Regions:
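Active-site neighborhood of phospho(di)ester-bond hydrolases with catalytic His/Asp-centered motifs
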Residues: 337-339, 363-369, 395-402, 445-446, ...
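Extended active-site neighborhood of metal-dependent phosphoesterases/phosphodiesterases
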Residues: 294, 305-322, 379-466, 491, ...
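Structural beta-strand segments of beta-rich domains
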Residues: 74-76, 84-86, 242-246
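Noncatalytic modules at the cell exterior or secretory-pathway interfaces
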Residues: 124-138
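Acidic, histidine-bearing metal-coordination/catalytic regions of metal-dependent phosphoesterases
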Residues: 158-337, 558, 567-591
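Active-site-proximal segments of metal-dependent phosphoesterases and phosphodiesterases across multiple
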Residues: 465-509, 523-527
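Bacterial Sec-dependent N-terminal signal peptides
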Residues: 1-24
């Protein structure tokens, strides 16, 4: 059983942006500000070869006194009302002990804490009442970061911990069965020393390893931005009948963006000027900053073809591209979907082949894991570059996967890369959303966010829809042969049954499976009586030794597949195609 008790990443992103403010060189800064300054200085003073060979000791020796103090005190802070003993659990596999740990008075004890994978040393220090200040996990990206347990030195005292930085700190009882990482809450403690049990456990996320990541950290993109617009991408954030969103990027030299667009056959050219979003990836040494533009075209004519180009008054322009709006009247339409693609060059070949083989396709979507690492902009550069001009002619939509929403830090880069509908649960705009295309309702759900906070919205959209076909798309497949998501089955399965959702599309596991119709957890003979759960893979395959699933209609090891679906009134025709253009599965549904 897989739990999805994930903490919303934005409260942890605050750790990268908040804390002491930068007013003068002699003031303590936040960890984020401190690392920003260090990285900027590194770029100015050291070449790429040096950046690629940095060691923990070299970095520590290069720190200025206030930088070192900030990194030793501003990572985790809280107030305690009584004297406490702080226990710090550090993964034994971490090669380098945090530079500040021993010098600040922490001492290693003989105790150990364990979960199914990691064994942690227990370090302890006594603190008086007042503020407790702790330092970074280290300069490496060691993902099982340290976590804390607190106990009053006087057992009769009642301990209160407040306020805490980062904000929204979760505190629970330190015990066997407790989780420590919100982005992996299925990983629970298996051994806790008796003397520590019942203390206050301060949980964390593995993404905190990235806050001071400098060793083996610097990257280069194969496709840096330039003054000429590239990465042209079409999406929707409103009605597909009368709107389109055009996105592109340039270097930071281009201060304003502009799109020229025209209805084909017309001599009238319209234009829209847009401001950039400045996107930083501070460890991307050859393209730290770039500008990303989004032009939202509205008031377009239904079922019409348009030409467009993007650029700026003072800079270069793209080649002319084209798009079409959706028809306002009921007509047949086709779309293509992919499972995980992981910014694969082979997937780029696959989507371009799919366009040639299915030129009538009106849009594409990816069921999560668009990239390997959602916070690495060089991975996004690969994704868009490998897709080529395909996504500048037909819209690309998506839902986030666990790789797009990295280590509990949220999917902010995904959100900035893709302009998506805001018809969403509160606070989940662009992550979970719905849109209707012709006679089909698409429910695009982000299951890396809490399910319970989306359930009422999901049911409301289904209850209000008069669409003939209903298709749900999300990354984690409820039915699979590796690790079934019983929480999705239990919470959303009855809703899919109640409103007769036709297809649930997903990925995550790298093989192919199309279920028989399922209702109330049981296989049904007639597709009209159940939902088909469908897993596919758009990149390299894995999971080759999965036993045959009892509910599977079709199942096989696979890689580099796409699915083309055509909806014509009350008929849905689907086929799965491999990289060689061969059909490997097909079926037809009718209403």
């Amino acid at each position: 059983m897989k739990k999805l008790h994930l903490l919303v990443g934005c409260i942890w992103v605050l750790a990268f942006a908040c804390g002491p403010q930068q007013d003068a060189d002699n003031e303590l800064l936040s960890v984020s500000e401190t690392i920003d300054r260090i990285v900027t200085r590194m770029y100015a003073e050291w070449d790429s070869e040096t950046l690629d060979t940095l060691s923990h000791d070299f970095i520590e020796q290069s720190l200025r006194p206030l930088e070192k103090e900030s990194l030793a005190t501003q990572y985790w802070k809280f107030q305690v009302n009584v004297p406490v003993t702080v226990s710090l659990m550090r993964d034994k596999a971490q090669k380098k002990i945090p530079f500040w740990l021993e010098s600040s008075g922490f001492r290693r004890t003989p105790m150990e804490v364990k979960n199914e994978i990691y064994t942690y040393e227990v370090w302890q220090k006594d603190f008086n009442s007042g503020e407790v200040q702790l330092g970074i996990n280290g300069f490496g990206k060691h993902r099982p970061v340290y976590f804390l347990a607190l106990a009053p030195q006087n057992p009769s005292d009642e301990l209160t911990v407040s306020p805490v930085f980062p904000q929204e700190q979760h505190i629970e009882q330190f015990r066997e069965g407790a989780f420590t990482y919100h982005d992996w809450d299925g990983l629970v403690l298996t051994e806790v020393p008796e003397s520590l049990q019942g203390q206050q456990l301060l949980t964390t996320i593995r993404g905190r390893a990235r806050e001071a990541h400098l060793v083996d950290a610097f990257r280069s993109t194969d496709f840096p931005s330039g003054d000429r617009p590239d990465q042209l991408l079409l999406t929707w954030s409103e009605d597909p009948v009368r709107s389109i969103d055009i996105q592109w990027r340039t270097s930071e030299n281009i201060a304003k963006g502009m799109v020229h667009y025209w209805k084909k056959g017309s001599t009238d050219t319209m234009q829209l000027e847009v401001d950039p979003y400045v996107m930083e990836d501070r460890l991307l040494q050859n393209d730290r900053y770039m500008h990303r533009f989004t032009a939202k075209l509205r008031g377009l004519d239904p079922g019409s073809a348009y030409g467009y180009r993007v650029g700026s008054i003072s800079g270069a322009w793209s080649e002319v591209q084209s798009f079409s709006t959706a028809a306002s009247q009921a007509v047949p339409f086709s779309f293509i979907w992919f499972g995980d693609v992981h910014n694969s060059a082979v997937w780029g070949n696959l989507i371009q082949k799919s366009e040639r083989q299915h030129p009538a396709t009106e849009f594409y979507f990816i069921a999560g894991d668009l990239v390997d690492t959602g916070l690495y902009r060089d991975d996004w550069d690969k994704l868009f570059t490998y897709a080529g001009e395909t996504i500048s002619r037909k819209p690309l939509l998506a839902v986030p996967g666990n790789h797009d929403s990295q280590d509990g830090l949220g999917a902010w880069m995904y959100e900035k890369m893709l302009s998506l509908p805001a018809d969403s649960p509160v606070g989940m705009e662009g992550r979970s959303y719905a849109f209707t295309y012709q006679n089909t309702l698409f429910l695009m759900m982000d299951v890396t966010l809490p399910l319970s906070e989306q359930t009422a919205w999901l049911e409301k959209k289904l209850s209000e829809s008069e669409a003939t076909w209903k298709i749900a798309v999300f990354h984690f497949p409820p039915y699979n042969g590796v690790e079934p998501y019983t929480d999705i089955q239990d919470l959303w399965g009855p809703i899919f049954d109640r409103y007769q959702v036709d297809l649930v599309l997903g990925g995550h596991f790298h093989y192919y499976m199309r279920s028989q119709p399922i209702r109330n957890g049981q296989v049904q003979a007639d597709p009209k009586d159940g939902t088909i759960y469908w897993i596919s893979i758009g990149t390299t395959g894995k999971n080759k030794d999965i036993e045959r699933e009892p509910y599977a209609a079709v199942q096989f090891p696979a890689e580099h597949l796409y699915q083309s679906i055509t909806i014509d009134g009350k008929e849905l025709r689907a086929e799965t195609i491999n990289l060689d253009g061969e059909q490997v599965d097909h079926f037809v549904l009718t209403k």
